[in-house]
């Protein structure tokens, strides 16, 4: 299966630039009777933001949920940390802080 075919199966989220509302295709839009798993491109032309009633043109693609943040072309740089999701980065950062704290506390045990 090609990379392009894989990208098309993922449902991208779209964010309203006016109010910050995020349309998530997995949930749909119960206010306008939009079924779950409906891609943004298949929404009716007269669909508007449920919060501020902005048109579809006011939305920008923010990508699928749970993916690495940043531009796709930059994910290969660095030590591999760029490919981690935000939740994985939080675990890495706070885990390292906790280990560092435990290390410095363990120095009190030295005589």
From Swiss-Prot:
Fe cation binds at residues 16, 19, 49, 52. One of its GO terms (biological process) is alkane catabolic process. Keywords: Electron transport, Iron, Metal-binding, Transport. It comes from the Bacteria. The keyword Zinc-finger does not apply. Its cofactor is Fe(3+). Coiled coil: none annotated. Residues 11-62 form the Rubredoxin-like domain. Pfam families: Rubredoxin. One of its GO terms (molecular function) is iron ion binding. PROSITE patterns: RUBREDOXIN_LIKE. Gene3D superfamilies: 2.20.28.10. The keyword Iron applies. Binds 1 Fe(3+) ion per subunit. InterPro entries: Rubredoxin-like_dom (IPR024934), Rubredoxin_dom (IPR024935), Rubredoxin_ET (IPR050526). Rubredoxin is a small nonheme, iron protein lacking acid-labile sulfide. Its single Fe, chelated to 4 Cys, functions as an electron acceptor and may also stabilize the conformation of the molecule. Could be involved in hydrogenase-linked redox processes. Belongs to the rubredoxin family. This is Rubredoxin. The gene is rub.
